[in-house]
Swiss-Prot record:
Protein name in UniProt: NADP(+)-dependent glutamate dehydrogenase
Temperature and thermostability: Optimum temperature is 90 degrees Celsius for oxidative deamination. Retains full activity after incubation for 10 minutes at temperatures up to 90 degrees Celsius.
Main function: Catalyzes the reversible oxidative deamination of L-glutamate to 2-oxoglutarate and ammonia, thereby playing a key role at the intersection of the carbon and nitrogen metabolic pathways. Shows a high preference for NADP(+)/NADPH as the acceptor/donor over NAD(+)/NADH. May function in vivo in the synthetic direction. Also catalyzes at very low rates the oxidative deamination of L-2-aminobutyrate, and the reductive amination of 2-oxovalerate and 2-oxobutyrate.
Keywords: NADP, Oxidoreductase
Pfam families: ELFV_dehydrog, ELFV_dehydrog_N
Subunit text: Homohexamer.
CDD domains (alphabetical): NAD_bind_1_Glu_DH (cd01076)
């Protein structure tokens, strides 16, 4: 997590720049620089040893001009309210850019979920759902998983909310297990979307992604699935890292093997990509510095900074994580001719899939995996095409500028039409 509100500061810089470049009034920035609502909750959990711990949680509802609030719930020991505000702001931009009928929100609990037993984790999840229940709902705020949470956590939360509501309420939470109103595509939707974004930009830059080399920073859900789908699309993954280090193999690292490690890690926390064939490097950031065509930072924010951007050698950076590149580092990359596909465009596959699941749940219908993936791919491809065309037109802009201004236009028009501005 960021220190001293740095991530929030960077996010506000992005919004400020977008407002200025888009020619929006100053009042628009003032309204976007503060969330509409901040919910702070205390969640008591009876631990396995019989004692009680009280965990601090948040739900930040940033802007709902376009529709219900939408964003994930993060369980992390170092999460701060400032981080949560920044992430909610990014969700507002991401949802707008994707053309979804959502505003932006984010939730968090300050906890290390790895230190909880399954029973303790379930009690915490249900406690959080109870605490925020009065201010969420299928037409109000629709949470989903994020770092430290998963489909099982969503299952506990939707069950708890349904008990409180006195009815089945599948559309209140998304990214649920397929056994409980979920869709199998959600497991890999973010990574798949990152791969689609990389493919579509590579097609326009170089004529295609076939044979292009890729390094992935982060072997969690987004990184592992992005690697898998990039290989399926014809690219060659030559480096990938996790918290224990980096493995490099110029001959290529099979996507199925990367996925296997990711799946093993769900059962055994000691599983690592260092078990894969190739050169082992103790530094997990070594994947950022490989001589490759495409870099996918897919772990945490602020990993490409002004103090290390000179070591980045990729020609194209596709942001799988939220905020992995600081504004100063991005300016340096831009000056060197390195293209950065911003997070609000590249990693929107997860929330687009959440939207599709929400639509299914509201209507009590179900699309099969192939149809769902087709719809997701079409939305991602169209979004990239729109942003790329605008970026080409505005020669002095970065692709993030094009994405942010495009997102802000939709939000501004909705707020103006409502009479909010």
């Amino acid at each position: 997590m960021s220190q001293n509100g740095q991530f929030l500061e960077y996010t506000l810089q992005v919004i400020r720049r977008g407002v200025e470049m888009g020619g929006f009034p100053e009042d628009f920035y003032k309204l976007l620089s503060r969330p509409k609502r901040i919910i702070q909750v205390s969640i008591p959990v009876k631990m396995d040893n019989g004692s009680y711990e009280v965990f601090e949680g948040y739900r930040v509802q940033h802007n709902d001009a376009l529709g219900p609030f939408k964003g994930g719930i993060r369980f992390h020991p170092e999460v701060t309210l400032a981080d949560d505000i920044a992430l909610a702001m990014l969700m507002t931009l991401k949802n707008s850019l994707a053309g979804l009928p959502y505003g932006g929100a984010k939730g968090a609990v300050r906890v290390d979920p790895r230190r909880l037993s399954r029973r303790e984790l379930e009690e915490l999840a249900r406690g959080y759902a109870r605490a925020v229940a009065p201010l969420i709902g299928e037409q109000l705020d629709i949470p989903a998983p994020d770092v430290g949470t998963d489909s099982q956590v969503m299952a506990w939360m939707v069950d708890e909310y349904s008990k409180l509501a006195g009815r089945n309420a599948p559309a209140v939470f998304t990214s649920k297990p397929p056994e409980l109103w979920g869709n199998p595509v959600r497991e890999y939707s973010t990574g798949f979307g990152v791969a689609v974004a990389a493919r579509e930009v590579a097609k326009r830059l170089w004529g295609g992604i076939e044979g292009k080399t890729v390094a992935v920073h982060g072997a969690g859900n987004t990184g592992a699935w992005a690697a898998y789908w990039l290989e399926k699309m014809g690219a060659k993954v030559v480096a990938i890292s996790d918290t224990r280090g980096t493995v490099v193999n110029k001959a290529g690292i099979p996507g199925e093997q990367i996925l296997k490690v990711y799946m093993e890690k769900k059962r055994d926390k000691s599983a690592t990509v260092l078990a894969l064939e190739g050169e082992k490097i103790a530094d997990s950031n070594a994947s950022l510095y490989q001589d490759v065509d495409i870099l996918v930072p897919a772990a945490i924010e602020n990993v490409v900074r002004e103090d290390n951007v000179g070591l980045v050698r990729a020609r194209l950076v596709v942001e799988g994580a939220n905020g992995p590149t600081t504004p100063g580092a991005e300016r340096r990359l831009y000056e060197r001719g390195v293209v950065v596909v911003p997070d609000i465009l590249a990693n929107a596959g997860g929330v687009i899939m959440s939207y599709l699941e929400w639509v299914e749940n509201l209507q009590w219908l179900f699309w099969d995996e192939e149809e769902t993936r087709r719809r997701l791919e079409a939305i991602m491809s169209n979004n990239v095409a729109r942003v790329y065309a605008r970026w080409e037109k505005e020669k002095s802009w970065t692709m993030r500028d094009a994405a942010v201004v495009t997102a802000l236009e939709r939000i501004y028009n909705a707020m103006k039409t409502r009479g909010w501005i």
